[in-house]
């Protein structure tokens, strides 16, 4: 998501919107991220982490597709669909953004137990910034080379679908032991 943090406001301005619209749209990502993390995290307690984590990645990919539709997809002869479509895509991207963090933490706890959570979670989030930084950097390089973010966004979509499929293929199991906390 650092690609979004680093490039989103510029992207919306490149679509022809005023910088205040771009900044407001970016804040919409944050607002919908809070709701998504709480709702999808809660639903993962009831319906399984793997399914909801995979759903979150798919939802973000769909959000990016909707964002692309807002600017039009020339090779598919789809004209720009405008600001309402852009805002819809933004909400989908934001809604799924922090849900991944909350569900991943819960999944790590379920899978490895609370006694290992700090180590597992710390290792995961020590590695994730490397990919995030690389994504933001490569997105900027692609923009500089092509003058558009479309390749970077399509790459995000492909990687999100791959992540969703990978997560969905993992067998779900809970840690055995006394370090589990009962859900209330």
Task: Annotate the PLM regions.
Residues 1-40, 101, 135:
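Extracytoplasmic gate region of multi-pass secondary transporters
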Residues 12-13, 43-44, 138-147:
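Interfacial helix-cap and linker-helix signal at transmembrane-aqueous boundaries
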Residues 46-58:
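Cytoplasmic membrane-interface "Motif A"-like loop-to-helix N-cap segments
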Residues 59-78:
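C-terminal ends and interior cores of transmembrane alpha-helices
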Residues 81-99:
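Hydrophobic core of transmembrane alpha-helices in multi-pass small-molecule transporters
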Residues 99-112:
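Intracellular juxtamembrane helix-capping segments at the cytosolic ends
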Residues 141-159:
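A membrane-interface helix-boundary motif in multi-pass transporters
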Residues 157-184:
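Multi-pass alpha-helical transporter architecture, strongest
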């Amino acid at each position: 998501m650092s690609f979004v943090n680093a490039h989103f406001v510029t992207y919306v301005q490149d679509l022809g919107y005023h910088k205040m619209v771009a900044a407001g749209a970016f804040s919409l990502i944050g607002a919908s991220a809070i709701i998504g993390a709480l709702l999808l995290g809660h639903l993962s307690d009831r319906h399984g982490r793997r399914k909801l984590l995979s759903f979150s990645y798919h939802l973000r990919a769909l959000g990016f597709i909707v964002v692309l539709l807002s600017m039009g997809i020339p090779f598919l002869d789809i004209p720009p669909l405008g600001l309402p479509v852009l805002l819809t895509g933004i909400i989908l991207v934001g809604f799924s953004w922090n849900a991944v963090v909350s569900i991943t933490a819960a999944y790590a706890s379920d899978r490895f137990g609370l006694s290992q959570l700090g180590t597992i979670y710390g290792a995961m989030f020590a590695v994730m910034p490397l990919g995030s930084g690389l994504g933001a950097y490569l997105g900027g390089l692609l923009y500089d080379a092509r003058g558009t973010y479309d390749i970077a966004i399509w790459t995000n979509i492909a990687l999100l679908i791959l992540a969703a499929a990978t997560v969905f293929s993992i067998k779900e199991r809970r840690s055995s032991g006394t370090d589990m906390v009962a859900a209330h």
